[in-house]
UniProtKB/Swiss-Prot annotation:
Alphabetical keyword list: Cytoplasm, GTPase activation, Membrane
Domain of life: Eukaryota
Domain Rho-GAP residues, every copy: 281-470
CDD domains: PH_ARHGAP9-like, RhoGAP_ARHGAP27_15_12_9
Primary location group: cytoplasm
Assigned GO CC terms: cytoplasm; plasma membrane
The organism of origin for this protein: Gallus gallus (Chicken)
Region of interest (Disordered), residue spans: 1-22
Name of the protein in its database record: Rho GTPase-activating protein 15
InterPro entries for this protein: PH-like_dom_sf, PH_domain, Rho-GAP, Rho_GTPase_activation_prot, RhoGAP_dom
């Protein structure tokens, strides 16, 4: 091996004594400090040849490192990097246990099966040079990705939930950048198999969460070359359960009889044992059930906010405690007597959060899917008077529950905007909060950023021109 004394570049020449199947490795260090942390490697290996000798390489600090072929092959991930870059990240759950949200900037590397989080862009290169270095990793097999504007006051936030119960929020203020990341991760998830391996890992997670770990611990023990008696015990349990087919068939037949004797859903509903939920039901069904055109829960929330929340800083923008919001959701779904002035709902952000959740969970949004493109075309009209008239015409065509609920809601939001000097919530701010919640396309396309802009503008226009849009025909 030769080393130049005038350059930072070190090269290795293959040993002539090696066979043609030997590994040739060249490690080149660049002049800059940043590039020295990220080294490029090239390797040539002919087929059917075992390499037993380690490959020596010299670094500028003259320290010796031995790198065998096994070390190279056992590197955790040699898949192609599909995308990498900086995003804001917050881990909000670990194994199903909720964590405090803490945003930090991370260098994210996306491959075909997983994502890795690093503190900076240099670390992926350092990870390959430091044995045992493990970045925070997200297995995408069986994972779920969705936009979650309710989880943060920041814009452009989406959440990744893994089968192991980990939850991550990712965010960027740059619209096209976050959209690219969302679609890249979603495509990676969609390409992965959703059977067997993912299902088994999901089952293992559920077993661990329910403390049913006897069999799992036994399997772990076996994989770690446990004592022979432990292996025999595990084999005995597995064989015993496999040979007990008669008992299982009897249990199965009893379950079939039990299920066949269960009353139908209609019978349970007629007896009042099962009731339609308020959250997640179609708007017209909720109104039919209550014999009204505006859901009672919507009216209650609006009255509570107007009593004690009109002057609260960031009303509707600031998120309330999610656990308390879910508790309020449960009370409403059980049709229990609701008093929003009760001390447990004293945080007005819990009330506003529940109201936003109600509209967000409607199977069809307040602006029905079939009207979405028509509203978008109307907001594109340049002339303001013509634009207002087009929007008013569309609003008048809405189903009665949608129109009446929309009128009540926007009248309320107009009162919020009137207190802008105190609560700092302008019509534009309210448009950003409620735009994606109240209207959205039935199927998301690549124009998500453009749609989001139109959604905000439509809500903003309807607030600023409320009297003209919801007024009489002569207005």
């Amino acid at each position: 091996m030769e080393r130049s004394t005038t350059s930072d570049t070190a090269s290795e020449k293959p040993n002539p004594s090696h066979s043609t199947g030997a590994v040739q490795m060249r490690i080149k260090n660049a002049n800059s400090h940043h590039d020295r942390l990220s080294q490029s490697k090239s390797m040539i290996l002919s087929d059917n040849v075992k390499v037993l000798e380690p490959i020596n390489r010299h670094r500028r600090n003259h320290s010796q490192h031995n790198l065998t072929l096994a070390d190279i092959i056992s590197t955790p991930d040699h898949t192609v990097v599909e995308k990498e870059g900086y995003l804001l990240k917050a881990k909000i759950a670990d194994g199903g246990k909720k964590l405090r949200k803490n945003w930090s900037t991370s260098w994210i590397v996306l491959t075909s099966r997983k994502m890795e989080f690093y503190k900076e862009s240099k670390q992926p290169a350092l990870a390959n040079l430091k044995p045992g270095y493990k970045p925070e990793c997200v297995d995408l097999c069986g994972a779920h990705i969705e936009w979650t504007p309710e989880k943060s006051s920041r814009k452009n936030v989406f959440q990744i939930t893994t089968v192991s119960g980990n939850e991550f929020l990712l965010q960027s203020d740059i619209d096209f950048l976050i959209l690219d990341w969302f679609h890249a991760i979603k495509n990676a998830i969609d390409r992965l198999p959703k059977e067997r391996s993912c299902t088994s890992r999901n089952l293992e997670f559920k077993l661990r969460r329910s403390s049913s770990t006897e069999l799992l611990n036994s399997l772990d023990t076996e994989s770690k070359e446990s004592k022979p008696e432990h292996r025999k015990s595990l084999i005995f349990r597995l064989n015993y359960s496999a040979s007990d087919s008669n008992d299982r068939s009897r249990v199965k037949s009893r379950l079939k009889k039990f299920i066949s004797r269960r009353p139908s859903l209609k019978t349970l509903q007629e007896k009042g044992l099962i009731k339609d939920q308020i959250f997640g039901s179609h708007l017209h069904l909720v109104c039919e059930h209550e014999n009204s055109t505006v859901p009672q829960f919507v009216r209650q929330c609006i009255k509570a906010v107007e009593r004690r929340g009109l002057e609260v800083d960031g009303i509707y923008r600031v998120s309330g405690n999610l656990a308390t919001i879910q508790k309020l959701r449960f009370v409403v779904n059980q049709e229990e007597k609701l008093n929003l002035d009760d001390s447990q709902w004293e945080d007005i952000h819990v009330v506003t959060g529940a109201l936003k959740m109600f509209f967000r969970e409607l199977p069809e949004p307040l602006f029905p899917y079939c009207f979405f493109e028509q509203f978008v075309e109307a907001i594109k009209i340049q002339d303001n008077a013509t634009r207002i008239k087009a929007v008013k015409t569309l609003v008048k065509k809405l189903p009665r529950p949608n129109y009446d609920t929309m009128k009540v809601l926007f009248e309320h939001l107009k009162k919020i905007a009137a207190k802008e000097s105190v609560n700092l919530m302008s019509t534009q701010s309210l448009g950003i909060v409620f735009g994606p919640t109240l209207l959205r396309p039935e199927k998301e396309t690549g124009n998500m950023a453009v749609h989001m802009l139109y959604q905000n503008q439509i809500v903003e226009l309807m607030l600023s021109e409320y009297s003209k849009i919801f007024g009489s025909e002569e207005d």
